[in-house]
């Protein structure tokens, strides 16, 4: 009996322990859920704070851009002093320009700059691209899609470097590594004596002005032709309508116009006779004034 009571006590203790463990686990789960909720709420708060910071930053950036634009408008360009102007003119006099009449196919400006910079420092470089018609035709028939340049100009800081570059590269291979794409290509380059970069810009501006003038003249001629064509069409419509009305009237009146030829519709305008008071004019054109009867009566009484 004593053993049975002890077993029952142990069983009750085990049940109590199990209940305690269940309560502990439930409380653990609840604490985990609460922690998760707290973390979510903290994350939401952080996100809201970040959004507020972003909005604040965007407002600050907008204000800064507005202020910068205002400052840029208010900035007045300072005039060069005579000393600075003289230095700039000396720099321009030292520069030399080379003309490239033939450029290797599909060579980019960066590659050309790296090739020519072996002879000296390069300031400006301009390459003339090919026409759009030739490019589209080449691509249409399965050609290369890269850009191709037909001519170019290069400005060296020192004219001695420009002369050296033109003397060594003109009509010769580019060379370099045999595996390079432009190893066997030939460049035609010429040094332009007494030619500066602003001369090139002036020439391009003149060409653009001439092109614009030609285009405007062609447009005006085309507009005149269109106007004359429209006027002729309107006149022909008007004449056709007049002829149709005349035919309708004649059909109503029952006149027989089978033998009569159709006369052209012309307007009869009243015109004054030509007259002239010049001495060398013809007698038919001279203006002959009618004699005044009252004046003749007075003169007859006097004399």
From Swiss-Prot:
The keyword rRNA processing applies. It comes from the Eukaryota. Gene3D superfamilies: 3.30.70.330. Residues 258-267, 284-296 have a biased composition (Basic and acidic residues). Keywords: Nucleus, Ribosome biogenesis, RNA-binding, rRNA processing. Residues 1-25, 243-303 are annotated as: Disordered. Residues 96-186 form the RRM domain. It is found in: Nucleus, Nucleolus. GO terms for molecular function: RNA binding. GO terms for biological process: endonucleolytic cleavage in 5'-ETS of tricistronic rRNA transcript (SSU-rRNA, 5.8S rRNA, LSU-rRNA); endonucleolytic cleavage in ITS1 to separate SSU-rRNA from 5.8S rRNA and LSU-rRNA from tricistronic rRNA transcript (SSU-rRNA, 5.8S rRNA, LSU-rRNA); endonucleolytic cleavage to generate mature 5'-end of SSU-rRNA from (SSU-rRNA, 5.8S rRNA, LSU-rRNA); small-subunit processome assembly. PANTHER family: ACTIVATOR OF BASAL TRANSCRIPTION 1 (PTHR12311:SF7). This is Pre-rRNA-processing protein ESF2. It comes from Debaryomyces hansenii (strain ATCC 36239 / CBS 767 / BCRC 21394 / JCM 1990 / NBRC 0083 / IGC 2968) (Yeast).
């Amino acid at each position: 009996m004593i053993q049975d009571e002890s077993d029952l006590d142990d069983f009750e203790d085990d049940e109590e322990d199990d209940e305690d463990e269940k309560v502990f686990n439930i409380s653990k789960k609840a604490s985990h859920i609460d922690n998760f909720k707290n973390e979510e709420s903290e994350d939401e708060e952080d996100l809201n704070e970040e959004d507020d910071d972003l909005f604040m930053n965007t407002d600050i950036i907008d204000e800064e851009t507005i202020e910068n634009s205002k400052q840029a408008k208010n900035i007045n360009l300072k005039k060069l002093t005579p000393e600075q102007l003289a230095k700039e003119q000396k720099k321009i006099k030292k520069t030399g320009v080379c003309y490239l009449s033939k450029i290797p196919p599909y060579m980019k400006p960066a590659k050309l700059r790296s090739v020519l910079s072996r002879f000296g420092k390069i300031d400006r470089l301009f390459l003339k691209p090919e026409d759009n018609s030739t490019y589209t035709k080449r691509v249409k028939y399965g050609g290369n899609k890269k850009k191709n340049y037909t001519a170019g100009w290069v400005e060296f800081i020192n004219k001695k470097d420009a002369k050296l570059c033109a003397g060594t590269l003109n009509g010769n291979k580019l060379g370099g590594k045999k595996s390079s794409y432009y190893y066997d290509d030939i460049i035609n380059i010429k040094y332009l004596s007494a030619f500066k970069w602003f001369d090139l810009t002036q020439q391009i501006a003149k060409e653009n002005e001439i092109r614009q003038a030609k285009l405007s003249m062609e447009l005006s001629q085309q507009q005149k032709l269109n106007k004359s064509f429209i006027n002729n069409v309107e006149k022909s419509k008007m004449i056709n309508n007049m002829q149709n009305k005349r035919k309708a009237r004649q059909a109503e009146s029952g006149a027989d116009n089978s033998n009569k030829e159709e006369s052209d519709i012309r307007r009869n305008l009243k015109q004054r006779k030509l007259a002239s008071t010049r001495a060398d004019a013809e007698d038919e054109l001279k203006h002959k004034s009618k004699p005044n009867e009252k004046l003749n009566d007075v003169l007859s009484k006097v004399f």
